[in-house]
Amino acid sequence: MTQQITLALSKGRIFEETLPLLAAAGIEVLEDPEKSRKLILPTSRPEVRVVLVRATDVPTYVQYGGADLGVAGKDSLIEHGGQGLFRPLDLKIAKCRVSVAVRADFDYREAVTQGSRLKVATKYTSIARDFFASKGVHVDLIKLYGSMELAPLTGLADAIVDLVSTGNTLKANNLVEVEQIMDISSHLVVNQAALKLKQAPLRRIIDAFASAVPQG
């Protein structure tokens, strides 16, 4: 009996950069998620399907068995905590960084040096809390889910902690990157129970991904 394999992906960059890895495993997604309204997409392998979820929800779907495996950014994995997940591969895709950014006219160094209590807007509260605690900087964290750049511009926050790729969005909103917290890439994550129950098919996919990941 063929075992059903469910892969959780998020739309956008991670989805697009995962396609060559799927191809290496002999799997082709048969519908374009940008054109289809479906949240479950068929593939060229009848036993493999792709479910489309929010990037931050991928670890949760995999942890609780809604998916057998998934591709998630390191940022999402840290915020999730990683419970119940086997993380065999750094796929080295969707690379970016988590950084601190402020208004161009805000003296961040001076505020930190003087021991000011900073208001920081972010959706990455665990990453931000650990980073500022390690520096001995006192912060009030404000949880936001989008349009992070607005927070300093409206006076809601002194700084933001967010993903940065090219930095163009920051520049367009008169913000500057003042500290880099960590580099981010996407990882393959696998449900630990599924790895035991569906070991052979999952191992084939993991091994195919591993062979396709660029070295160095």
UniProtKB/Swiss-Prot annotation:
Identify a single GO molecular function assigned to this protein: ATP binding
* Species the sequence originates in: Acidovorax ebreus (strain TPSY) (Diaphorobacter sp. (strain TPSY))
**Self-association or partners: how does it assemble?**
Heteromultimer composed of HisG and HisZ subunits.
Q: Tell me its family.
A: Belongs to the ATP phosphoribosyltransferase family. Short subfamily.
Task: Name the domain of life.
Answer: Bacteria
Compartments where found: Cytoplasm
Predominant location: cytoplasm
EC annotation?
2.4.2.17
- What's this chain's function? Catalyzes the condensation of ATP and 5-phosphoribose 1-diphosphate to form N'-(5'-phosphoribosyl)-ATP (PR-ATP). Has a crucial role in the pathway because the rate of histidine biosynthesis seems to be controlled primarily by regulation of HisG enzymatic activity.
One Pfam entry name: HisG
One GO biological process from the UniProt record? L-histidine biosynthetic process
Q: Which HAMAP family match?
A: HisG_Short
The UniProt keyword set, sorted, is: Amino-acid biosynthesis, ATP-binding, Cytoplasm, Glycosyltransferase, Histidine biosynthesis, Nucleotide-binding, Transferase
Q: Which InterPro entries match?
A: ATP_PRibTrfase_cat (IPR013820), ATP_PRibTrfase_CS (IPR018198), ATP_PRibTrfase_HisG (IPR001348), ATP_PRibTrfase_HisG_short (IPR024893)
The protein's annotated catalytic reaction(s) are: 1-(5-phospho-beta-D-ribosyl)-ATP + diphosphate = 5-phospho-alpha-D-ribose 1-diphosphate + ATP
- Comment, domains: Lacks the C-terminal regulatory region which is replaced by HisZ.
| Stretches assigned to coiled coil | none
Pathway of this protein? Amino-acid biosynthesis; L-histidine biosynthesis; L-histidine from 5-phospho-alpha-D-ribose 1-diphosphate: step 1/9
Q: What is this protein called?
A: ATP phosphoribosyltransferase
Query: One cellular component GO annotation, for this chain's record?
Result: cytoplasm
